[in-house]
Amino acid sequence: MTMAASEQHGKPFVGELLGRSDYAIIGEIVEPGAKVLDLGCGEGELLEWLAENKGVDARGVEISGARVQRAIARGVSVYQGDIDQGLADYPDQAFDYVILSQTLQETRQPLRVLREMLRVGRRAIVAFPNFGHWRVRLSMLTTGRAPKTRLFPYDWYDSPNIHFLTVDDFEQLARMEGLAVERRFFLAGHSAVGMLPNLRAEVAVFLVRR
């Protein structure tokens, strides 16, 4: 699965992988045969796809015991763990890619998690919903309440999201940490966003390294 070269309504069109456009981007980035660790991997769907279609050595970490069992049933190597506690079980530079897809905003210590990703991996792929999207801003402006949008569908009291970041926030963090941003992708639905991504992108995907 790669980014399609076609245009829809004049905008570059991004395909889907397992129902998600950010997975399509991740599926494009990861090189065949790579060693991959997916943090917060859920039931292992992405790892299963990468193993079958890219021939990767796929490993995962997931906090939910039920999801770990379902991932193992898929034939994916996943262990139960809390990524906020670090990745002490893995040596330095053990993986080619460490993936964190729409989970960063749910971690208690996002900076520690990012640093651990780049300790155990040569590159990190980080995807997150953009809290700076215009619909989020408009919702807060017009209602004066915590926003509920397609990407942030939860009420404030039951949301798994505890750190709300924007595209510009992550760019600033990368500079602060001295990270090299190798690739950036900005998505709105299935369209790639070019101009004003902090305002127009619903989801961002970054490929970074030390």
Predicted segments with their positions:
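Class I SAM-dependent methyltransferase SAM/SAH-binding core
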Residues: 49-86
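Conserved alpha-helix/loop element of class I SAM-dependent methyltransferases that forms part
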Residues: 17-33
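S-adenosyl-L-methionine-dependent methyltransferase catalytic module, highlighting the catalytic core
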Residues: 111-116, 123-210
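Class I SAM-dependent methyltransferase Rossmann-like catalytic core
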Residues: 4-18
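Conserved SAM/SAH-binding loop
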Residues: 43
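Conserved beta-strand/loop positions that form the S-adenosyl-L-methionine
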Residues: 39
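A short SAM/SAH-binding and catalytic strip from SAM-dependent methyltransferases
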Residues: 97-108
